[in-house]
Amino acid sequence: MYTHVDVVGIAEASAALYVQKDRDRYLDVLTTIENFIYQHKCILTGESAHLLFLKKSIYLYEFYSDNVAEHSKALATLLYNLDPEYLTRYTVLITKIPNHWYVINVDQREFVRLYAIPAVKQHLPIPILPFHCTSALTQQDLFCLGPELQLIQIYSKLCNPNFVEEWPTLLDYEKNMRTLFLEQFPEKLEKTGGKKEKEEKHESIIKKIILEMVSTHQRIVVGGYIQKNLYNHVIKNRNRLQLITSLNIYEEKDIIQQFCDSNGLKIKICVNNPLLPTNPELRRLTIYFNNNDDQSYLIVDMYNTGSYELVPTNQINTLDNSFLIGTPFVQARFLLVEIWVLMLIAQQTKKDTKKIIQFFINQYETLMNSPWPSIEALFPSSSKRYLGNYVDPNALIKWAQLKLKRIPPFYPGRPDEESC
């Protein structure tokens, strides 16, 4: 006769024992890596940062360094010297992109990915980055990306079908990171200070520009004037509109300028770098409406994300028009990008952005606490629901390598080899 057997439980228990045995084998390697990160104040990113926050074991360390070439070589040498006759004999440092990205393998296993911090490091304010958590392995406080930046990374992957196998795990990470972000956000809000942001006026003119912005299916609405409810989107003359474009950002600048000039609308357009360390290619186009009293009103923020990646969308029909809107995870991602930018502005200019930041954080909470729409609305399965341009990550790496000198792998056990 058949009896009930807890197959899953037995498998999990067996796997846990195997994983712990494997981890014990490389304990010195993992400890050395964490000590190095702590001593050199490197900043964990990606899944390493998520696991650090959850106080779970880390098997692959991804982190930023302010001297990535020298740090990668020094860490590889440290790991090799742990047991050069046996376990760490085959330690190799691989240059993915010179002075930007390095990988360290030990015993034919990848343990470390080091990235160069973008040149904007000096602009990153203390309240946002770095954040620190206690390691479950060494009990040291290690630096990692703040929860808002980790959430931006998570939402980016939840919008990318290439990471479909990771989605269940990413959803768990998202829930925990969102809780932390909302808990510690009021403390950040108190650090902005200054005067209140002025209210926007001239609603009919602004609405004309807004409707033009959403009239083409080359742009995706992700926030601002649109209410955060998939079933009741309404154009609102309140705060700014957020868009994603699939065109080159400077091409968009010319198109918008031409439209406003032909309609006698006085605007000012700026293209800037949001200084997002996890997405250095991101650029933001900002449109200001100029009033006759020489006051400027910020009405549109447009991001170039669609020019280098695919963005999942839903189509919305209103009395005014039909337009594309990003899925909830796309909306959440760019609400956090907007909050990041506003906090940078507050940090660098001492301008009070509390009111507008609170508006965006309320939208974020409303969006994430609303009943989830259908699975198809969250994770579109049709290729027609994705807008933008797909760029193969491997092609990007090869393109970056071609621009720079190719450096062969560095073996710590062979000091006469060419240095990285």
From Swiss-Prot:
Organism this protein belongs to: African swine fever virus (isolate Tick/Malawi/Lil 20-1/1983) (ASFV)
Protein name: Uncharacterized protein K421R
Principal location: virion
Compartments, as annotated in UniProt: Virion
Keywords for this protein: Late protein, Virion
Highest taxon listed in the record's lineage: Viruses
Family indicated by similarity: Belongs to the asfivirus K421R family.
Induction record: Expressed in the late phase of the viral replicative cycle.
Any one GO cellular component localisation term in the record: virion component
